[in-house]
Amino acid sequence: KSYGWGGLYIGDISQPRGGPRLTGHKSHQIGLDVDIWLKPKAYTFLSISERETVPPISMSKSGGALVNHNWTETHHKVLREISKDERVARIFIFPGAKVKMCREEKGDKNWLRKVRPWWGHNYHIHIRLKCPDDAYKCQDQYPPPKDKESSEERLFKYKQFIGNQLHSI
C-alpha cells in the first residue's frame, strides 16, 4: 500500500499441502506457489462475481520481449519489495520486465537473481516460496544462478527464440 496500490490481487494459490485442483497450473499443486496480478488493487473488497471478472492487464509487447506502456516504476518497486521476503525463492515474470529492471535498477542488483524470466507471465507474477521450516520432506530448489549475461544479451537470445517460434507456425 505504500506504493499507492490498495493491495494486491491474488490469483491461483496453492493448497497448503498440494494436491489435485479442478483448474489452474500444474505447478500450483505442491503448496508453494501463488500468482499475483500485475495490477494495482482498486479497492479492498470484491464480490464473488467481481473477483471472477476483474480484467487482466498485459504489461508486455513483442511477444514478451519488451514492456509496454502499462509497466511503471511502481511495478519494479513492488517486485523488489516482494523479493526481499526471505520466504520467496523465485519470482517468474515475462523476460522484457526482467531486462527492464536489470537496466534500471540502481545500486545492489542481487535481488534480481530471484526474478526469473519465463513466458506466459505478462499479466501476473508467479511466486515460488521456499519450504517452510516444519516441512521436513520438502526440498527447496537450488538457489537461482548468478546472472552471468547482461540483460541485453538475454533480450537478444529471447528475441531469437520468439522469432524461431513464430517462423515454425
Q: Which sequence ranges carry the predicted segments?
A:
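Sec-exported extracytoplasmic/periplasmic mature domains
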Residues: 1-4, 15, 41-42, 83-87
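Extended, low-complexity, intrinsically disordered C-terminal regulatory tails
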Residues: 1-25, 92-114
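Extracellular/periplasmic catalytic domains that process cell-envelope and extracellular macromolecules
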Residues: 3, 26-31, 83, 118-121
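Loop/turn elements at helix/coil->beta-strand transitions in domains of secreted/extracellular proteins
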Residues: 4-8, 32-33, 84-91
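Short, functionally critical alpha-helical segments immediately adjacent to catalytic or ligand/cofactor-binding
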Residues: 10-14, 33, 127
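Solvent-exposed coil/turn segments that connect beta secondary-structure elements
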Residues: 13-16, 39-41, 96, 130-133
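Acidic/His-rich structured neighborhood in mature extracellular/periplasmic domains
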Residues: 15-66
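Catalytic cores and adjacent binding grooves of peptidoglycan-active enzymes
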Residues: 46-169
